[in-house]
Amino acid sequence: MNPVELPAPAADRELVAALRQDLLAAEFTNERVAQLLGADALAAMERDQLVPGMLRIAELLSTDGTPDPCAVLAGLWLLGLDIPAGQLQAALPRLGVEGLRRLNLVHPAAAERPTAEAHGTPGADDAERYRPSVDLRPYQAEQEQVLVDLWVASDLPAAQLQGPLHPEHVLGIGGASLTLAASIHRTPVQRALEIGTGCGIQLLHLLDHAEHVVATDLSRRALDFTEFNLVLNAPALRLDPGDLGARVELVQGSLLEPVAGRRFDLIISNPPFVITPRPRGEQIQARYTYRDGGRAGDELMAELIGALPEHLTDSGTAQLLGNWEIQDQDAWDARPRLWCAGFPAEVDAWFIQRDRQDSAQYAETWLRDASTQRDPESYRRRYAEYLEDFGSRAVLAVGFGMIFLRRRSVDAGSAEARAITPWRRFEELTGAVEQPLGPVLGATAARAESAARDPQAVFDTVLAVAPDVTEERHQRFGAVHPEVILARQGAGLRRSRAVSSAAAGLLGAADGEYQAAALITAVAALMADESTDQEDLEQALRSEVLELYVEGYLSES
């Protein structure tokens, strides 16, 4: 079954303005949709199961009189139902069916597609029914510290299609995009860059705190979706729909090529990092542009990570998602460490591995993502290609995670620049975290820079145990002393780490009354004995306190 590519939405300013007014009048928002569908149907939709929602919408649309406009739009765009023209006209009176067609948002239905009538809605001829050409759904983003209702258009999701995705598929709101949005440390910046913008979800957030944003994508189709979404949400984003270029620059091209020689205060990306076999005779047009950058293995990530520092301003940061090949189960970070090996000393790097999959699991994940299983012969062939490809590089697994880079602001050639110790952190945190993570990541990186720049200043600071930190002791029954003492965070990254008895004593005494240096001296004096020198204990405690401070177990009082 060949995938079908539908036209991208048109960004006609007058028609989009009419659509915006209709969506507002229909209250087509997350809150209203949740009220209409109910918790069970919403939960099923998150699992790509549409039947409960279809049944609920059929019930709502079968009532006498004019149907609820929000129910009509939810049935059309969230559930992929074929909707009678009269109901669409009533739900979107300013734009109308003709306007919907001119914007490429709907097209005439075919008999084999699901209809509301199949679930009890009064009928109409197929010629009078329309089906969605795009996925258009409510979204919320913070603008000037207030959550505002927005809408995001993208290609139809796999659950609404009958075959594999088209190679030029434009992805919509998904888990990865939401994870990235929640992980960005948001501070006011002049210039921001998004690499691989897709349908522009991240732009909706960036425009709240960036004066000017450049968004790149290899796909012209993706940029068309992005332009449509910007025009549709222009008033909420403080954009002039007639002059998007005043704040937004949409550029077609691969990765950083379109911005050669330019620097940015913030760079973010959910890049096309998916590792894909490169079989002999592969056709470029068969690649999934939204996820496949055309390189072998994880070379795209290596290329992108290696080039990012030269595009960062002083104090500039880059945050992205990515994955990396693992050839040694005990050294998941070998590839990320290699990518950072050539960084200047003033560039900090932090990799957090959130998940890992063995090679077979990885293949299955991305074959399902493209709905390849709907063509069994193609699925088996592509699965074999994945395993052969991983085997050729002795890849055992693939790690997924978040990446945070920052260029410190130092004068090149200065004594400070020469004395810099790079902050390179690689940690595996696969447990639940508290979102949004952005403030936590930003604060951690700032503390790391402070500790590296002037550790004595940390010791001269009054520190207290963070309010979410608890102590956990493990010991055998009847034992006098614990064998393991853990400090556990209840918020943010929710780390847990083993601490020494001395550090546990210091944490117990860190109530915000004393400088860290005084606590270190007092605890070391109490715990020193014939076998433990006080000076050695103080030195060990100083190192441990710096780590506890950077990781957020200790905070400034």
Language model: regions and residue ranges:
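Acidic, low-complexity/disordered tracts enriched in E/D and polar residues
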Residues: 2-71, 130-132, 160, 410-508, ...
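SAM-dependent Rossmann-like transferase core, predominantly class I methyltransferases
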Residues: 110-192, 197-209
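Conserved SAM-binding motif I beta-strand of class I
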Residues: 212-217
